[in-house]
Amino acid sequence: GLRYWKSQGSAALLGKVAAKVKTASTREIPYQKWIVRHLPSARELERQRREKFEFQPKISIVIPLYKTNEKYLRQLVDTIRNQTYPNWELCLSDGSGANSPIARILEALKASDERIKVVSHAEPLQISENTNAAIEIATGDYIAFADHDDELTPHALFECVKALNKNREIKVLYSDEDKMSMDGHKFFQPHFKPDYNP
């Protein structure tokens, strides 16, 4: 304060104040706290479920599978079923080959929801062939790509359709992505993508 100003002078005091202000303004909020603040509340998710868009495109979520861990597969499907936007179909291509370890679970998933489509292959497929096979069974207006160990936040498709309703000329949408702890309680390593700039 005053003692520092008397001993060091005005320029030194201003420099010290500026450094403190800069430090305070650039202090980062821990990401986990930030993401929790920005995820929609249960009330907001319910509001989204009731909202009826003028334009309601079907979104085909295509996923290539290869000997996928059953736990991750179920978690993925649960996050898709839990979407606040309901007009989707899930197109799964099992490229595991003969005696696929996930054949039974895929049949059960297909039987449980008419929006889930499955195609299986006798021979193992590379990821590009497997993805193309999933695209071939898609009937939606838009295609969304996901990996077999991904999860979607409940409002993911809602936000895409909201953007499409604001601008029907949109041909391609992309989103930010994040990593999540194995127990699903902690988010880390966000990848915030910039606005499209050709």
Model-based region annotation:
Residues 63, 91-94, 173-176:
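Short beta-strand segments
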Residues 14-81:
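N-proximal low-complexity "stem/linker" segments adjacent to membrane-targeting elements
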Residues 121-138:
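Glycine-rich, basic loop-to-helix element that forms the pyrophosphate-binding segment
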Residues 86, 94-105, 123-124, 147:
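A conserved acidic beta->alpha catalytic loop
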Residues 151, 155-187:
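Conserved donor NDP-sugar-binding/catalytic core segment of glycosyltransferases
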Residues 77-87, 166:
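Short, acidic, metal-binding catalytic loop of nucleotide-sugar glycosyltransferases
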Residues 143:
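Short aromatic/hydrophobic "clamp" motif used to bind/position activated sugar donors
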Residues 183-198:
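Short, flexible, basic/aromatic active-site loop/helix in glycosyltransferases
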